């Protein structure tokens, strides 16, 4: 009898310990997750977050938040014939987000503090035309496992779906395959690993949709993958975080299409694209470099190679947080007149940024038949000069220095001329690309190429050695 009581008592104690630990772990997981949740919501630009329901249980809790987002209204008719409100008023959306927190220490067969399931329950305020267009689209979901140290390991999913504008041609549609986004974040929020996979996105617009006698459009993107690994120094940084990343894209095509049997014209396509980037920190200054390459078609001209390199240097870490806030607020502005912050707020950020002479360099090149065309540019913002009474924009123009070089082989312009004439016929004035470059006088003509050089320094603009202003 005594042994039975002892065993029973032990079971009760263990059960109470599990219940107590589950409740405590649930609270700890909620605390860590809520902090990150608030930061993410802020970075995404929501105007208001309101918690309307919170139910805490021993083994499971649930929260319902309303996220308010104000968006500018699209041009009239963009969302279907039934949505003809041309009042110009912004669209206010209310997103109902449901979060279910399943407390540890055992959740879904794994040892963890909690698992948090997040889903978008409904959205209020969507114009009727857009609501009909999204009838075959499903809301995104996310599942996050919270470790005992506050680390997070999860996956967000956008299910496959399509968007079809109401009362439109059957070919007017956007469709996509399931997008997955895997993330892993350390307890101190400094180590981050992200992976995005999007197998396919297609978007078709029938000829005539953009206007009478206007061609339609067909866009295809397939095999997009992005991998990011970051080792940060401050969990509040999101604009530039030390680490490295790779991007791969199997295929991207943008074409115009016609109803009269005319062959589709490729505006731009790229295949086998792969790029790598790295962000580094010296302790005070940040820098980044990126390069990518693939095969491409530009204006129906197939290139043997499309290359891209870019670098940013001398970014003072002290400006990251205020600069992030300014960029975020500019992105939220629905009126262009309200997008730029006032000078009193912007000046200290720009002054600190300019003090280290930040520089941006970029090069884009394409090769055809062994000949390479390129655009090569470099911009430097030197320390501001003069007193604070001088307008900030004027000070920046005086210290900004920019150089842009363009080189275009005639072997490439000849191929462009041939392709354009084959697709659209000869220009009414008989003036092809070379002729237009010659008439405009922007580029200098050489025996086998066109060249142009633009320089800006001390508030003066030079084109090919000649002062413009």
Language model: regions and residue ranges:
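Glycine-rich, small/hydroxylated-residue low-complexity segments
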Residues: 5-9, 16-469
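Short, low-complexity patches enriched in S/T/P/G
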Residues: 1-2
């Amino acid at each position: 009898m005594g042994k039975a009581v002892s065993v029973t008592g032990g079971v009760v104690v263990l059960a109470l310990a599990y219940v107590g630990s589950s409740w405590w772990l649930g609270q700890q997981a909620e605390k860590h997750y809520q902090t990150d949740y608030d930061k993410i919501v802020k970075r995404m630009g929501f105007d208001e977050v309101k918690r309307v329901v919170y139910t805490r249980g021993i083994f499971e809790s649930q929260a319902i938040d309303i996220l308010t987002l104000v968006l500018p209204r699209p041009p009239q008719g963009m969302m279907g014939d039934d949505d003809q409100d041309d009042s110009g008023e912004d669209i206010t959306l209310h997103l109902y987000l449901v979060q279910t927190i399943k407390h540890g220490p055992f959740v879904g067969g794994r040892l963890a503090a909690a698992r948090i399931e997040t889903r978008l329950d409904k959205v209020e305020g969507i114009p009727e035309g857009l609501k009909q267009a999204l009838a075959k689209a499903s809301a995104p979901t996310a599942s996050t496992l919270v470790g005992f140290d506050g680390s997070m390991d999860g996956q967000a999913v956008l299910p496959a779906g399509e968007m079809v504008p109401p009362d439109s041609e059957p070919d007017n549609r956007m469709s996509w395959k399931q997008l997955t986004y895997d993330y892993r974040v350390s307890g101190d929020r400094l180590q981050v690993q992200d992976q995005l996979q999007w197998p396919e996105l297609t978007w078709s617009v029938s000829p005539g949709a953009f206007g009478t006698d206007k061609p339609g459009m067909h866009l295809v993107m397939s095999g997009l993958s992005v991998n990011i690994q970051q080792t940060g120094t401050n969990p509040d940084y999101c604009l530039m975080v030390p680490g490295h990343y790779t991007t791969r894209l199997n295929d991207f095509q943008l074409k115009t299409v016609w109803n009269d049997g005319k062959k589709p014209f490729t505006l731009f396509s790229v295949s086998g694209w792969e790029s790598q980037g790295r962000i580094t920190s010296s302790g005070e200054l940040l820098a980044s470099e990126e390069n990518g390459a693939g095969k491409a078609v530009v204006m129906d001209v197939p290139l043997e190679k499309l290359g891209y390199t870019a670098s940013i240097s001398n970014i003072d870490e002290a400006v990251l947080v205020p600069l992030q806030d300014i960029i975020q607020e500019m992105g939220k502005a629905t009126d262009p007149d309200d997008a730029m912050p006032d000078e009193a707020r912007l000046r200290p950020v720009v002054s600190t940024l300019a003090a280290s002479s930040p520089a941006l360099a970029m090069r884009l090149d394409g090769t055809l038949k062994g000949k390479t065309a390129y655009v090569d540019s470099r911009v430097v913002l030197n320390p501001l000069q003069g007193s604070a009474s001088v307008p900030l924009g004027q000070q920046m123009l005086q210290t900004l220095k920019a150089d842009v070089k363009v080189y275009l082989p005639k072997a490439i312009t000849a191929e462009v001329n041939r392709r354009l004439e084959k697709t659209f016929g000869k220009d009414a004035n008989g003036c092809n690309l070379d002729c237009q470059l010659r008439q405009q006088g922007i580029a200098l003509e050489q025996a086998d190429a066109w060249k142009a050089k633009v320089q800006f320094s001390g508030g003066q603009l030079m084109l090919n050695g000649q002062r413009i202003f």
